[in-house]
Amino acid sequence: MSKSQTEGIFGRAVGNLYRGGPANVSWEQALEGLEAGDAERTPNHLPHSAAQLVAHVQFWQAHLLDTLAGKQPATPEHAADGWPAPDDWETLRATFLRDAATLRDHARDPELCAALNREGVPHAAILTSYAGHSVYHLGQVVAVRQALGLWPPPGGGDTW
């Protein structure tokens, strides 16, 4: 297998973590049909609403995009600082999905993935780590929707 083929396979695999793939629904599917009132509801036995989870992941997506752009965003001193209050749901969802698509495209860019950050870590490693974080919380959003009786979404989704 050529280097180009390997890079393409890696890029698709990591890119799919940001948009969904064979092992999970996409963020678009998970958020489909979720209205603001429901997105802001927290089931009694769960710690977060879907909107809170999306705001948290968006915080880190924005942090990663700044990092990849060569900026040095501050890392929160405390975990709670990475959980901003959700803004307007429609705006949050649109911004979140736009940034997830940008990260997917970055993950599919061999030159960007090979580039090193200031600490000498390849961007591919950082993108993969953040993708794992995103998918973890994607599962939580699905669990919140299930607990609220809002799963599967209108367009369908895995029910197990």
Question: What is the meaning of each model-derived region?
Answer:
Residues M1-N24, E28-L31, A36-A80, N117-W160:
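Short, contiguous alpha-helical
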